[in-house]
Amino acid sequence: MGTRKADPRQPDKQRAVRVLVALNAPMYSTSALEAAANLAARYHSELEALLIEDEELLWVANLPFTREIDRVSGALRDMDNVRVVRALKVQRQFLNRALVGVCGKLKVSSRVRVVRGDFLSEALTAAAEAEIAILTRASHTATPPPAGQRLLRTAPARGTRRKPVWSLFDGSPASGRALIQAGTIAAEGATELVVAVPESAAGGRRKLETEARTLLGANAMRARFVVVPRAEIGALFQSMWPQGCRLLFLGRDSIDLSTRQTAAWLKQPACPMVVMA
């Protein structure tokens, strides 16, 4: 009797999986942290939080002629490098507390790594070395929030409609693994799953929809399928914008993450991306 061949799109919990979440120092969301912790728990992996501090911001703060507007009074004042560094230190403390809280509930070990540089460059470099990477947006905030300001976004108010979870499925093994996790996250959050299928995908969109429903199993009942003209961030963004997005799941090779479109995406108030190898 032959041995049944494993589906490469199904998660292999026996192998070591590196789970990483890349966070912009001035702002990060609870959705990204919770999704990362949940994925780390499923794979029995440690969660690595990469906190990226804006190197350019620190350089600007050192210039003698740099000014900033006070958030409270609106007054123009000198930009203080010492205050910026102090605020960044406070943010690391906030992140550590947030990780302890989120990961403690799931009994997931975690660690924080801090780097300074360009957010997109550092995030993509780190993502290329991880089996699962969660990328949050690059904030437009010019300076870090004051030390006492709450950094984490709060949960939606009671009665507020939950934003759907999105997944790009093109038939590749990585996009299949991403789809399975997206379905699980959507089910656990009692929210809708929107599956984006590229119109230009090989084999045709109907075949992909059938394949996606098979992979989702019982979670296919909450799935809604949309067709995007091509597998690009811009096309996805146009589809997502009217409905909103909680998380976007995709395979690492489904979209070129090094393009200007990706950089623009990560600067928008959009949802975190979960990139799976």
Annotate the PLM regions:
Residues 40, 103, 127, 186, ...:
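A generic structural signal for well-ordered alpha-helical segments
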Residues 95, 99, 211-212, 261-265:
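A general structural detector for well-ordered alpha-helical segments in enzyme core domains, enriched
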